Design a protein with these regions (language model features):
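Regulatory cytosolic signal-relay segments
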Residues: 1-19
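Beta-strand-turn-beta hairpins that frame and shape the catalytic cleft
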Residues: 3-6, 31-34, 101-105, 145-148
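Short acidic, Gly/Ser-rich segments with clustered Asp/Glu that frequently serve as metal-coordination loops
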Residues: 16-17, 42-50
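Acidic loop->beta-strand submotif enriched in PP2C/PPM serine/threonine phosphatases
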Residues: 18-31, 125-149
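Catalytic core of PPM/PP2C metal-dependent serine/threonine phosphatase domains
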Residues: 21, 52-121, 132, 138-140
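Membrane-embedded alpha-helical signal segments
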Residues: 29-35, 48, 56
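Conserved beta-strand-loop-short alpha-helix elements that form
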Residues: 33-45, 109, 142-149
């Protein structure tokens, strides 16, 4: 154990003219020393984007918090979410940050811009492993956390 703590904050802003936000963040405590944070981004904006991003973040955060394997979580999402017929992309993308004991973080990223990590006041290019799960390109990273990351 260490003296680090995780500070989690976010702000969702609706697209101009929309009543709902197409992004959704879900934070779930998983046991005493584990937190799962999921950012899901629904394609476009409005009701459809909001529903799909909420569905995505809720399914993933619940499954990850219950300790299910990454492959099963992604397979479930891939089977659940529709694919845009004109663009051929999923209607929702996601980034997962799984913080364990405030010591390490597992980053799992699908089709979102990569997480930007600032370490020692500079951009830190952390290692990423590319995985293919059910035809989806997933990036996974495991990081040892440091003060002020």
């Amino acid at each position: 154990m260490n003296d680090l703590c995780t500070d989690i904050g976010y702000k969702s802003i609706n697209h101009y003219g929309e009543q709902l936000c197409g992004d959704h963040v879900d934070v779930v405590e998983s046991g005493e020393n584990s937190t799962v944070i999921v950012l899901a981004d629904g394609l476009g904006s409005g009701v459809k984007a909001s529903i799909l991003s909420t569905l995505t973040s809720k399914i993933i955060s619940t499954m990850m918090a219950e300790g299910l394997p990454l492959e099963e979580c992604v397979s479930t999402i891939a089977a659940t979410l529709p694919v845009c017929s004109s663009r051929g992309v999923a209607y929702s993308t996601f980034t997962i940050v799984h913080v364990i004991n405030n010591e390490s973080a597992e980053l799992i990223q699908y089709d979102n811009p990569h997480v930007i990590l600032i370490r020692d006041e500079e951009y830190y290019d952390y290692p990423k492993t590319e995985m293919n799960i059910d035809g989806k390109k997933i990036y996974k990273s495991v990081l040892k956390l440091r003060e002020n990351d």
